[in-house]
Each structure stands twice: as structure tokens, then as C-alpha cells.
Amino acid sequence: MLKYLNQSEAINVDLELFNEYKFSVDQLMELAGLSCAHAIAKCFPADRFGRVLVCCGPGNNGGDGLVCARHLALMGYLPVLYYPKPTPKPLYENLAHQCKRMEIESISECPSVALAAECYDLIVDALFGFSFKPPVRADFVPVVELLQQTKLPIASVDIPSGWDVEAGKLNECDMEPTLLISLTAPKLCAKHFKGKHHFLGGRFVPPALQRKYELNLPTYPGNEMCLEL
């Protein structure tokens, strides 16, 4: 049976990938963001959902979002970045620079619900990952409220933003994405996910690490970067 990770297990799996298996952060981020773009393309084709608002947070989840935006652009989408608190580290600065050089538009103000409905077909939620602890910081309140109130479909990267990593929704107004892309392995909160599509991405887990944590990951078909759970 597929294992759902608690918060400490998710953190430890990541640490082992870095320390024991010598993956770099940017290496895993590239593979994770690429798999997110592939999952989005399977569920929301570019000819109908081409205008994508990609909301990025300050940590690794936001980095995954920056990578995802770049690959969506290469797949024929028109992503627009909302990145309210850029991380002042070379990795994130480079990812943001790559998006800029890919001619991906960036906005500095979070759009209203009405403006988002007019300008976009889909929202990518790459705000907070499995290290998130509430409450939401002031910088991110407007975009979390947009995610809670919009009628647009939402694709969440690893954890729906604002959810508890293990318990899921903390209150009734928390958003419910249409697509959840669990990375490496699903987290416990995914058991509470009621949206239409749940995908697994991040095809990089070494066999010994899978065995140690009894992840029981499904086999990815062929050369796929993601699979539907």
C-alpha cells in the first residue's frame, strides 16, 4: 500500500536525498517542477487553459513553481508569475532570472478574484510546502484569500497552501484544488484531498530509500514524469 508521509518523514526523506544520495537542491527542484508541468498539461491542455497564474512562495515549493512556469512556457502556455517575496539566494535568483529571460511576465500585485477570472484560466499554487506552519504571513494573505475565493481551477504543488501537512484543511474556507501534485511521495494531508486529479511527481527516489521508508511507490509507466494516483 502506498505510504503517506507525516511532516517529519517528509523532511527526513528530503535530507537523505541531499546528504546520503548527494542530490543537489536545484537538481531535485528541476525534476519536481518539470513533473508538475507535465501533470498540469495532462489535466489542463494549453488550448483551453493557456493563461496560467503561477503563485510562488519563498521556499522550495516556490522554487518548484518557478521551474514549473518555465516548462509550461516551453509547452505553449502563457504563464504569469506572482512572486511576492523573492528569496535572496543564488538558486532562486537564477530561477527567477531564467523566467524573465524566457519572457514570462511577472506581476507585483495580487489580482482580485474578478480580475483573475478575467485574465487567467488556471492558477498554480506553489506557495507553501511541507515545512509550512500556520499562520499565513501578512505578505501572503491576499494570494491565499484569492485561492480560497476563486472559481478558477487550481493546481497545488505538493501541499495545498494553508493546509496542515498532516491534518489537511484547518477550516472550511480553506481552498480545495482541482489537481494536487504530490512530490516524491504523498503527504498525510493528501488523504483529505477531494479534488478531481491527484498525481505523483518527482521520479528520482532511489530504491534503497524507498525500501527504508516503505514508500511502496507505484511504478511510473514508460518514460512518464508523473502518474495519476
Swiss-Prot record:
It is an enzyme of class 5 (isomerase). Its cofactor is K(+). Binds 1 potassium ion per subunit. Residues 10-217 form the YjeF N-terminal domain. Keywords: Isomerase, Metal-binding, NAD, NADP, Nucleotide-binding, Potassium. GO terms for molecular function: metal ion binding; NAD(P)HX epimerase activity; nucleotide binding. Belongs to the NnrE/AIBP family. This is NAD(P)H-hydrate epimerase.
